[in-house]
Amino acid sequence: MGIDVQKTNDTLIEFWNSSIALSKEDMDEERKNEVRDYRDLAPSEKLFHAVEELGSCKKVLDYGCGSGWASIVAAKSGCSDVTAVDMGQNIIDALDFYADLYEVKSCIKSLKISSDWLSTVKSDSFDGFVCSNVLDVVPVEVSKEILKETARIVTKDAKIVIGLNFYMSKEAAESRGMSLVDGKYLFVNDVLRLVSMSDEEWVELFKPYFKVEKLDHFAWPGEQKETRRLFILKRT
């Protein structure tokens, strides 16, 4: 059957740009919070500690940064040169707001990018890389291109952190009244929300460019089982 990659990407950018947008009221409410700890930004303790290790890197890239939790954690943990990129202006505005709120704006360079931005980056530019909940919410063709370019722009000894959602089987999807297009793509209201691939399938996708140093599983707050994936990679 196949999917329309360009249409899927355009819809994703529009969806996330709208979802992560902060209103003036949102910002005012955030500023009222007198107790603020950057360690609470990460969706799991395991993910926090993985990104915390990027603090020792000289230059970190947060690809698909969202509201910037990983960029802030890396900066707070010691990295003074973090580049945070995403494809929606509302997303970048949210990142800038939180970077200022957590007093690390001077350490984070934010960029609204296009889909071909990685190809413009010089080789061996970053010794730290984080990509959380991006590779498994875009078409596989896009993930492959991201991985290919990432392998080129990171250094040989770079620390690479990849966060992924859970695997959902065809049967599990059907039990929820949903179906997987091409056996792996889960759409909700015409928006791609999950590329459901097993741990082994992801390892195969990484294999041309990276070796897996560690695979762990974690849960988001409120989840009973640790089914989300945390990969630590090294360039081959």
Annotate each PLM feature.
Residues M1-G55, G66-L118, V138, V142, ...:
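Class I (Rossmann-like) S-adenosyl-L-methionine-dependent methyltransferase catalytic domain
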Residues Y63:
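Conserved beta-strand/loop positions that form the S-adenosyl-L-methionine
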Residues S119-F129:
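A short acidic, Gly/Pro-enriched loop at the edge of an enzyme's catalytic core
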Residues K144-K156:
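A short glycine-rich, Lys/Arg-flanked "PGG" loop and its adjoining helix->strand segment in the class I
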